[in-house]
Amino acid sequence: MTESLLSTTNISLVYDDGARVTHALRDVTIEIPNKRFVGIMGPSGSGKSSLLYILSGLKRPTGGDVRLGDYGYKAHSDLDLIDLRRQRFGFVFQQPYLLVWQTAMENVLMGAPILDAAARKKAVGYFEQLGIGAMAEKLPSQLSGGEKQRVCVARAMMNDPDIIFADEPTASLDHANGHLVVDLLSAYRKHGTVVVVTHDPEMLQGADSVLLMRDGQSLGWRDPVDVLGAAGPSKTVAL
């Protein structure tokens, strides 16, 4: 088995507002190997997005720890985790965020370690693969929500991160453009790991494995073919 790149041990996440205690995650222990395309699926409130945010260091768990190789999150400060995210992670959030005063290309090149002709050529390649080649010099105000999301996908890849974390990356896209994004993320496993949260099993048919979540607990890894088959025409999985 490939050595684990990212792992969790007994992760829990509890919200207590004084009136109610909510267990968002309960004792989640998983391993994600290097250079894999994996999905996290579950119904609303299952904890899948919370787990993604903890894996990426954007949220601290109530208990347990996350490790990236030998790097334990618990032993490091919030500033350390900011540096970790900048140096080793790429992000695609459900709601696209772009700097409104910069063109789509300028937003993508922000993710490049060196701004040179090679970086621009690389960015142009991503734009073409994502079907937004004609949008490179447009401002975000001139783009649709789906076009903005595809720009964010290109930006996430520009610095060749070890891991790309994507939270519902196809939610604002039609079927065809959703597949463009998924195909590009799937191909990225040649360079690094991709972790995708989605409600649509069809978007994970090319994944290496899918983690099913319910009520804040891990139900274990599944073969994407089995998950897609269980979903049927409704595109929902009974958990």
What residues fall within each predicted segment?
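Conserved ABC ATPase "signature" region
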Residues: 72, 117-135
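Helix-to-loop junction immediately C-terminal to a conserved catalytic motif
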Residues: 56
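Catalytic Walker B motif of ABC-type/P-loop ATPase nucleotide-binding domains
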Residues: 164-167
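Conserved ABC ATPase signature
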Residues: 139-143, 147
